[in-house]
From Swiss-Prot:
The keyword Disulfide bond applies. One of its GO terms (molecular function) is ATP binding. The active site is at 256 (proton acceptor), 258 (cysteine radical intermediate), 260 (proton acceptor). Heterotetramer composed of a homodimer of the large subunit (R1) and a homodimer of the small subunit (R2). Larger multisubunit protein complex are also active, composed of (R1)n(R2)n. It comes from the Viruses. The record marks 75, 273 as: Important for hydrogen atom transfer. This is Putative ribonucleoside-diphosphate reductase large subunit. Its EC number is 1.17.4.1. The record marks 534-535 as: Important for electron transfer.
Amino acid sequence: MTSAVSFPITSQASDMLSKFYGSDLGSLYGTLAEKYSGGKPELAEKLRDYACKGWFGYSSPILTSVTGSGLPISCFLLYVPDTIEGLVDHTSELRWLSVMGGGVAGHWDDVRGPSAKSCGTIPFLHTVDADMSAYWQGKVRRGSYAAYMSISHPDLIEFITMRTPTGDVNRKNLNLHHGVNITDTFMRCVERGENWDLVDPKSGAVAHTVSARELWERILETRFRTGEPYLNFIDTANRGLHPALKRKGLKIRGSNLCNEIHLPTAADRTAVCCLSSVNLERYDEWRETDLVECLVEMLDNVIQTFVDEAPLKTPHTARAVRSAAGERSIGLGAMGWARYLQKHRIPFDSEEAVRLTGIIFRGIKSAAVRATRALAKERGEAPDLTGYGVRNAHLLAVAPNANSALLLGTSPSVEPEIGAAYVHRTRVGSHQAVNPYLKRDLESLGLDTEEVWDSIVSNKGSVQHIAALPDSLKKVYKTSFEMDQRVIVRQAAERQRHLCQGQSLNLFFPIGADKTNLSDVHRLAWKSGCKGLYYLRTCAGRTGHKIFEAKKNPEKTEECTACQG
């Protein structure tokens, strides 16, 4: 089953297809529709048609699963036990899951701190750091791992700075990502200026007592310098856990590689999530259709494929298969949000955008719940969900989805764009990116010239310097660094009300940002109900390269490094 896509394919998307998928997009979509239709011709036809219209995108693991080289799973979340046997087993499991193509996260809260009989967590994390260079994701790119640790762990202070390049190289973990599980109690201590105890999870003894505010400031300083650690508001996440899973005594102990998955882990349970994303840029085209229902069914079929095929590849998937079969959680997300707003000339950091994101995601949630209830009637409830009338414990999670967005020629995820014109660097090389809606508006004003575009790139993708551009359009095309980050957080909080999992939420601050404002924005994310914060991006203030010169002389193209996180 093949068909031509009805949206333009960029040169960058074409290069990615050629290098990683060896197929034209229409043929690839046809193959995927057949594979994940569950044997239903009508669903296969709809999936093919909706994909070719650019209404949604598959995650990279699902795209590559047609080659048979890996599993269609994006995320694996592993509990790390406090025993030598458990630590060795964790290493073995993460290696195999990485080779199977998934990103891996480890939840380290329960591993004891350093003592006369224990070296603590950092040396064990160092072995994981080495593994990521050796055990490649899907055998095509270096492995990816995120470690999560409690805000009260004795190793926390060293953990926070383990990705900074100075210090003992044997205790640095530059190949890993990391996140801190932050509790409500800690945040209240920060607000009140109280002390905070770092407590050994094994003995219960207080290892250190520190100022909560100073620890908070240290975390933010490290985020500002390196982009990490992620912040994972663990109590908020656990409040959103499905009640059936709570009744089983399960709890969330961390997030995933991209901080949007919030599922329970345990010694016998490795959380799994498969992903797909609707394209909000084309929301007006699909809003009255059954797109969301079709994608929920498709992702449930992906889960079943994993349950059926994973044990045949390695026995080290047993915990993941148990979790996937038991709760059948999926992660339907979104991309193209910035482009949708630009299409309709709505500023990203506006009250109207906050209102619209609530309306749109309320509708997506309602459709997803209808779909999982229908699947429960047709196929049965998941074993962990008996009596709740649903097939899938969790349904919605907004991932970064940069590669999926690239294939569809839209903006990634639900975040603002870094600029209206820039050099976009991905795993297939560097390409020039020009905002099509700004081009539309510049054409209408007689400003679509090489000189204007060169000035935009020279000003880090900004249009604020263009005198002939009306203020109303300058607001629409603000870069992510020109926006009020508090409005971005408020918008994310409105969206979070309708997400059973989370969202990869980035923040953007210029070099020299006010420390008080930085802290206030992060605290607002916690107070307003966001489950976590992903990267903190900083703008280094360098100018871009002449985009049209790069087009004429591709051999001289340089990569834009203006914005670093």
